[in-house]
Amino acid sequence: GIFRAYEAEVVQSPIDADGVIPQALEETFTRLEREGRKVKFFYTIPNYHNPAGVCISEERRPQIVEICKRHHVLIVEDNPYGLLGFDGRTYTSFKSLAPDHVLYLGSVSKIFAPGYRVGWACAPSAMCEKLKLASESAILCPTSMGQYSISMYLSEFDWRNQISTFRGMYRSRRDAMIQALNDYLPMCQWNVPEGGFYTWVKLPQGLDAKDMLPRAVTNLVAYVSGTAFYANGEGRDHMRLSYCYPNEQDIREGVRRISEVVNRDLELVSLFG
């Protein structure tokens, strides 16, 4: 993705239902240090993760901060979905736990309007000047109209109530997604996200989401193969489904179309292995 575009070497660390696993993160840092590979930063989406939909538990957050401090690794906390918990819950930010050790990123594209490519960064003071220079070289200048529109919206409208409206809408669409998965893809496994945009679906053994995608597109439905979210080529047995844009009826129809492709591929696997 974006990191590879800048020729970064990306190394992944495992997660589970409670997010990043502290012990595994420590082991990853230690292994890389032993190999003489300097870790530049630790990037994470701690809340309603894309694509897994999980949140790092409150218990793990201070542990992760201490591990990163101990190994002198900056935390890049990307939090575009943090206000989209369906029950209104918010989590302790890494930034609040270690202000001088965290670069915090936010965006209006997920909570107001995706067409406004406006975001913000809260950086340690020592990084601010370098961050401004990097931003100027990468994007020259964000759209003035977009920034002005968002500024007016935040100052003159009830944006908190609008986010609450979005939460209710996304919860309903999440429910439609889960019901459709139960009805059409009972042979698969999935999480039930408590916020954000995505459901992470595991396919039955023998199926390949990346290989299956062209057949899904032919059936007028699409998803993102799990391989897009791994640094090492894994994830062929997973697909990311998004419920943020389509309405409940379209979500159900989309899952039904995916199920047709899955069932056809399962038949081929049973016949030919």
Predicted segment positions?
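PLP-dependent class I/II
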Residues: 1-273
